[in-house]
Amino acid sequence: LRITATGATGFLGSYFVDNLINKGFTLRGTHYSPGKKQTLLSKNVQPVYMDLGRLGTFPNAVKDTDILIHLAAYYTFTGKRSLYYKLNVDATGILAEQALKHGVKRFIYCSSTEAIGPVDNPPGDEETPPSPQFDYGRSKLLAEQKIREIAANGLSYTIVRPSGLYGPGNVNDVSYWFITSFAKGGFFSKLKIGRGGTLIQFAHVDDVAKGFALVVERLEKSENQVFILSEDRAYTYNEVYKILSEIAGNPPLKYSLSPKTAKLILSFTHLYALVKGDNNILLRRNIVDSITKHRAYSIEKAKRLLGYSPRYYLKEGLKETIEWYG
């Protein structure tokens, strides 16, 4: 099989590429800079230039390819709405059209559980009516819809929705800021928002990378399917706080803020973040709405059809991650 992965040098992409190489696959990976090209060459991955913002580069990724794994994305929760739609929605639709045109046999798309959004009656699953909370999740959901529209013309696809990724190598996203806030004794290691009973579900990057590899290995069972990949259980925020405090050697959280008070305080840090261009979502008011809504999902479908079996539990994975952060 001729396999190409976009975003092959990113956080998830790096783990996925390593996983496939360890299984004996050969593959191509896209890059957008000379430094990233060298990273791929060092792994014996054939580098292919592609930039989500330059549509003319898309044919490079789909030519002479049987399976295209589209991992590249505009990933932030504090970005520009126009870029979400340009780079996540429109670019995905055009790439899927190019894949169909060039005879790609399977288009595997990395979406997110943010395409589902918060869940009123957890756990949510692949059939849960979506109600994404952030523009990032809305863009992922719209990209999924684009893929299904193109699939009506003959494109074979698989959509994968990982939950919140974490693990060694992760920087500058919501998991990174949340974990390092505890590791460095920041604001979120001192005070919690609300009562802490809301459910949250994480996914270690290595488990998700292995899940994507299973999709490649089980093409028949994964055809035109949607899968959620995550750890096999959710945690209350209180449980997460306890785990992080123990690992970081911090005293247990004793104090909490009401969501209303937290929003008032964060209105000042929100303004600061906007002025400074700081993408840390923990400084934004809308983090309160996120923390006070359930994000818990079932992975039973992936277990049943793919044989997906995540190895990492949160305490083990967070300990490994914090040690990597140093």
Positions of predicted regions on the chain:
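Mid/C-terminal beta-alpha module of Rossmann-like enzyme folds, strongest
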Residues: V215-L282, I299, K315, K319-E320
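NAD(P)H-binding glycine-rich loop region in Rossmannoid oxidoreductase-like domains
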Residues: V45-V89, Q98, P118
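Glycine-rich Rossmann NAD(P)(H)-binding loop
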Residues: T6, G167, K192-T198, F227-A234, ...
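Conserved Rossmann-fold NAD(P)-dependent oxidoreductase catalytic core, especially the SDR/UDP-sugar
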Residues: I94-Y136, T158
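A conserved pocket-lining segment of Rossmann-fold NAD(P)-dependent short-chain dehydrogenase/reductase
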Residues: T180-A203, D207, G211-L214, I228
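Conserved beta-loop-beta element that borders a ligand/cofactor-binding pocket
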Residues: E144-P168
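N-terminal Rossmann NAD(P)H-binding glycine-rich loop of SDR-like oxidoreductase domains
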Residues: L1-K23
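Amphipathic terminal alpha-helices
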Residues: K293, Y297-L305, S309, Y313-G326
